[in-house]
Amino acid sequence: MANLTLVQAINLALIQEMEKDNRVLLLGEDIGLNGGVFRATEGLFQRFGENRVVDTPLAESGIMGTAIGLAMGGLRPIPEIQFEGFLGPAFDQLTNQCARSNTRTRGALTCPLVLRVPVGGGIHAPEHHSDSPEAIYTHTWT
C-alpha cells in the first residue's frame, strides 16, 4: 500500500469516483485550474474537463444551491467550500433543503451529494479559516 498524504488520498478518491461514475462532478471556488486551496483537486480539471470540475464564484450559498439542484436532478455532485467558517451562508440550504428533501417529498426526491469542507484548517489563520463547529452539523440532520 502506498503512503499518501491526506490531500493525495482525497485526490485519488475523487479520481476513482469520477472514473467509476460519470454522474460525479465537482464544484467550488478555485477547484479547477488552481486545483483547490489545499490542492486536493489538482489535475482533475485537465483530466475530466470543465463540465465535471466546475469553478464557481465566491458564493457559498450558490455553490450549495447548485449542488442540491444537481443532486435532485440525478447527478452526484461533490461541492467544496474552502473553509468550514464560510459554510454559514449555505447552512439553510444544506439543512432545510438537502437534509430534508426525502422526508419533505415523501421519498420522491433525494439529495445524494458529498460535501467537502476542511475543518480546523491546520493553518492557524484568523477568523473563518480555523473553525471546528462540527457538532452543529451532527445535530441538525433529519
Regions found by a protein language model. Give the residues of each.
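Thiamine diphosphate
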Residues: 1-142
